[in-house]
Amino acid sequence: VTKTNACLCDERTDELLFAPLVDRFGRVAKKLRLSVTDRCNFRCHFCMPLNPVWLPKEQILTYEEMGRVAQILARMGVTKIRLSGGEPLVRRDVERLVAMLSAIPEVESVTMTTNGFFLPEMAERLKKAGLTGVTVSLHSLKPDRFEGIVGRKEVFDRVMAGIQKARQFGLPVKVNVVITRGCNDDEILDFAELARRTGMTVRFIEYMPFDGQKLWSPERLVSGDEILRTINRHFPLVALPREPGSTAQVYRFADGALGEIAVITSMTMPFCHDCDRIRLTADGKIVPCLFSKDEYDLRPLLRGGADDATIARFIRHAFWRKFSGVATLLETAQYVGHVRPMHTIGG
C-alpha cells in the first residue's frame, strides 16, 4: 500500500468512526447527560438515600477525562450537553468544566440541572464560563414542606435567591418539580401561577422509581394527564409543537400569559421512539438509557492509554445496544428496584 493510499484509508476509517452515533433502532444521539458527581447536599427521597455511600474519589472522572469524552461525542454529532449530579455545584471549580465544554466548536449549548443552593455564589461565574441555562429542582413552594422533601433546614429562601441570581445574570431558568401524590400534588396550580408570574417554564415530572429511599409505588404516581387536567380547569393551555427528541411536551397559556408549562411523562407516555440522549456517569459508565441496567465502563480505556478512535468504537458499541424503550419494563414492573438510585445516574 502506498503512503498516499494509507493516508486515504486512515481518513476513511476516521470518517466512519466519527460518523453520527446511531443505535440499532435508528435513533441518533444528539444530547449528552453528564453526571459530574454522585454527591449532593440534599436528601430528596425520590433520588437520594438517607445515608448514601459515595463513590471513592479516585473512581470519579477528572474534568479532563469528561472533556475528552465530550469532545469525542461532539465529533460524533452530539451538540447539547446537560450537567447533572448528584448536585453538580458541590464539585469544586465546576465552572472550569463548563468552560472546557462550551469551548468545543460543535457544542451549541451547555446547561445544568441543580438544586439551586449554590447559585447565589455561582451564577455569575457559571454564566461567564459559558453556561447557557439552568434548571432548578424546586419540589414545593411551601418552605416547611420543601425543607422536609429535601431533608435540610433553612434552605428554601436560599434556593429562591439562587433562581433570582441566575436570572439577574442572564441565565434562562426552568423549574423542575416531581409531583408525588399525598406530598405536593396540592401545589400544581401554585406552580402554574409561578410560571405565569415569572415567565419561567415549569416542568412537571412524573415520579419515577429510582428513589434512593424505596418509597415509590404506583399509587403515588400523578400522571402528566392528571396534572394537565388540573391546570386546564383554571388556566387553559395550548400545546406547542414537540421538538423531536424532547423529553417534555410544552404548553403555553391560552390567555397569552407569560411562562410555559411542560410535562415529562416518563412513566405513562414514554418518549422512547425518538430519544436522542446518551448518559455518562461520574464514574465513567456509559448508560444508554435511564431505565437500563446495562452499563459500559469507559474509565479503564480513558486511564489505560486508549486513543480517541478506540474510545469512539467503544461508545458506538454501547450506544448501538440501547434497547427499544421502557414499555415492556413498565408492563412487567421490572423497573422497580433499579440497580442505581437517581443521584448516581444523572437526571
List PLM regions with ranges.
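Radical SAM enzyme [4Fe-4S]-AdoMet core and its adjacent flexible, acidic
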Residues: 144, 152-262, 266, 300-302
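Radical SAM/AdoMet-radical enzyme domain recognition
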Residues: 63-83, 90-205
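N-terminal [4Fe-4S]-dependent radical SAM core
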Residues: 1-33, 43, 75, 248-260, ...
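Pocket-edge positions in alpha/beta enzyme catalytic cores
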Residues: 24, 58-61, 86, 111, ...
